[in-house]
Amino acid sequence: MITHSLFRVLILSSLVSVCPALLAQAPAAASAKAAAPASDPVAEAAFDAFFKLRDQPGAVPSAERFDQLIKSGVPLLAQYPKNRRTGTVIGKLGDVAQGINDRKLLPLRDVWFSQLNFAIINARQSATDDDGKAAVMALAAANANAQARLIGDKDSLEAAREKIDALAAQPGGDRFIADQEMNFVEVIKGRSPAMAEKLVTQLKDHKNKTLASRATDELRIMEVRKTPFDLKFTSVDGKPFDAAALRGKKAVFLHYWSVDNEASVKEFDVLKEKYFEQRERVEIVSVNLDPAEKRPAVDKVIKDKKVKWPQLVDGSGMKAEVAARINIRSVPNGAMLDRAGMLAVPRARAWQIDTELKKMGFKF
């Protein structure tokens, strides 16, 4: 458990780096998945209205829009804290400021934080039960995490830690603690990857099983990212493939798919376009996650799609090592290696290839 005073001392002594002793506070009660209540048409309509407003194409940030988002989203937390989409509302509200990237509009980030903080205070006072209070406190933690991510000074980091610890101590907070602890890990990672790894190492033993599982997955990714991603196999056409041969030349996109998942099969069509458009910048490798008995169907898809790039098919199914190594448990899915062979994007889809290549510094 981290105390406020200990956290402050360690933050100051490490010049705003996160300290190794950054332990998460245990939740007030053991984690348990509460049964979701029956669907409420009124609630679902309210959630739909919020998501439509939040994801409105071309919406321009402004104080008026912020007010609309807050009035549409914040009351849902206290009213429907156990709704399956409450966590998503918290996430959508929590990342509003991060989506403001136009330099001329950057001052609006502070406007958003101010308006949301005021709304959180009012919502917490109006919450009538522990679950509602926990949901509002989760939003407070999400907002503090967002400020810490964008500001990164000792006060914002300390404030985020305090909000998360308060959420952990709140009855009902265990429903939301995993998201906020892992968000805090991302904040710390931007300041000190080594400190983030120490924090995740501690979180993997947390009594909240969801949090412990996510921390374990994150640790696996952190470990993979320490060295170039090793990938060497013989493709279905008999040709050898070794990712090491591409280092310094191309990025690599890993496409995970299964014959039973239509979306992952359709992604071959998008990848064919990328293969011809970006073949000088990226190598595509498809990794099949079907069991051995489905090999005939797998071969048929590869033949019908007229795939030109390497195909890894070993019949291991979802237990394939190249998938398990980076926590791939479902399809469609993907990942990207940069030109140095390092895991750059643990989760990626075909339509993201161009954007990620630009982030890696490839010229178009």
Listing of model-derived features with the role each one plays in the protein:
Residues 79-87, 99-106, 119-155, 166-178, ...:
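Short solvent-exposed coil/turn linkers within tandem alpha-helical repeat scaffolds
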Residues 242-265:
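Short active-site neighborhood of thiol/selenol oxidoreductases, capturing the structured segment around
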Residues 263-305, 315-324:
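Structural microenvironment flanking redox-active thiols in thiol-disulfide oxidoreductases
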Residues 305-307, 314-359:
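Thiol/disulfide oxidoreductase modules built on the thioredoxin-like
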Residues 9-21:
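Bacterial N-terminal signal peptides
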